[in-house]
Amino acid sequence: LRLLLKLLLLLLGQQKHWPERQQQQQPQPWLDRQQQQQQHNQQLQKQQWPEGQRQQLWPEQQQQQWPEQHQQAQQQQQWPQQQPQMQQEQWPQQQPQVQQQQQWPQQQHRRQHGQQQQCMNSQQQLQQCGQQQQQQLQQQWSEQQQQQQQQQWPEQPEQQQQQQWPEQQQQQWSDQNQQQQAQQWQAQQQQQWPQQQQQPQQQQQQQQQQDLGPDGVGIVVPYLGSSPADFEVQNLGVSVLPRIKLPLPKFDNDD
């Protein structure tokens, strides 16, 4: 048993170290190929471009390639400096447009304000003209009336006024009397109107009381039907039309 265990341990230890040994023993062809390719490329370069030719050709190529690269670098460096110059060159052309855009609402507002002021001024002028015309017309009218009155009323107007005054006074007095009478009549009507309305009601009630009679002299037959038919008076046997006053028969003591 002990031997078997030792053998198993040895086998396991060999299996653990086996891949490392295998890698060490196995060759690596791809590394060799890379090294060989690099060496081959170096040899080709040496053959095609010897050291003297490379030294001779390099300054010319460098001179040709350098200005192009230098120009590009200068352009990149100078571009932010040139940009404001271009903006400054174009700015005077763009500036009037901007000023026009900025000034346009102000000018429009000024125009509108000027038009409003003109309208207000024109309205004020019209009002002033109308007032002046009214004043002129009133003055002319008053002057004409004064002239006509002076023509109609000569130097002695008081006498004519005294002559005409009684007639005018009588007419005015009669007019005032008529107005007062009309007002009094209206007031009387307003006062008498409820009394006149009450009078027919009182008369109707009195007529009904008279028809019935306190002593039983007469009787009223009410209208009960929908058509004017004859009705009999209660306990009398007499056929009468509605609302006709009938005398009651007189009964003797013997009957």
Curated annotation (Swiss-Prot):
Sequence repeats lie at residues 18-48, 49-57, 58-65, 66-78, 79-90, 91-103, 104-140, 141-152, 153-164, 165-172, 173-192, 193-210. Residues 18-210 are annotated as: 12 X approximate tandem repeats, Gln-rich. This is Antigen LPMC-61. Residues 149-210 have a biased composition (Low complexity). Signal peptide: none annotated. Keywords: Disulfide bond, Repeat, Sporozoite, Sporulation. May be covalently linked by disulfide bonds to other polypeptides to form the 80 kDa antigen. It comes from Eimeria tenella. GO terms for biological process: sporulation resulting in formation of a cellular spore.
